[in-house]
Amino acid sequence: MTRSLPSATRLDVTGYGYQAEALPPAGEAPRPEDDPRRWFEHPERPFELEIGSGKGTFLIQESPHRPEHNFLGIEWMMAFWRYAADRARRRGMQNVRMLHADAVEFIRQRVVDESIHTFHLYFSDPWPKSRHHRRRVVQDATLQEFHRVIEPGGTLRIVTDHDELWAWYEEHVARCPLFEREPYEPCVSAKPNELVGSNFERKFIPEGRHFRGMTLRRRSPV
């Protein structure tokens, strides 16, 4: 899967790539000093976070359209993380950073309350076997975490091509009162007939796959 990527020895993530294991130990709860917005030159700007960035195509395409926003991509696969961080560095994209981490764990331990403007969850691993369903990003508990860290009126954007995972999303969203479901609008950088414009989407559009998306807007606590 990673054979087409450049050798790691030719990739430079300096200033753009962060690793969770290299960060100071996390506290019992997220602390201001752990806030990843501090990794940007302008930490006060709206902060968007993508879970599962792969090679970084969405971030590389979307961020120039919204230079007033900061974008953090979290990727678990080391080779993809390095490649995406190097892409951002070579382009001098000051509003993009990449993190190698378990996304849910990082959010729970290090993302402070009401700090995320938008979450992006595109083509997440469906983990189709029943015994692996607990590994799916969207769970009852993670929706509560997303609500904690999303700012008032902020959103969680979800896209998938996997029918069973889509049903899983709908089931969990239906019983979660923390978000209001809204129609999904394609990303600014998406081409006609695309929802996101990722490598994955472009690879499988010719096969006629059905892509579906939803937007969840954070409701204020009652």
Regions found by a protein language model. Give the residues of each.
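A short acidic, Gly/Pro-enriched loop at the edge of an enzyme's catalytic core
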Residues: Q109-T118
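S-adenosyl-L-methionine
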Residues: M1-L49, T57-P64
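Conserved proline-anchored active-site loop of SAM-dependent methyltransferases
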Residues: H117-P128
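Conserved beta-strand signature within the Rossmann-like core of class I S-adenosyl-L-methionine
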Residues: G153-T160
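Class I S-adenosylmethionine-dependent transferase superfamily signal
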Residues: F119, F146-H147, L156, Y169
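A short glycine-rich, Lys/Arg-flanked "PGG" loop and its adjoining helix->strand segment in the class I
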Residues: V138-P152
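SAM cofactor-binding core of SAM-dependent methyltransferases
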Residues: P46-E105
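Class I S-adenosyl-L-methionine
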Residues: E171, R175-V222
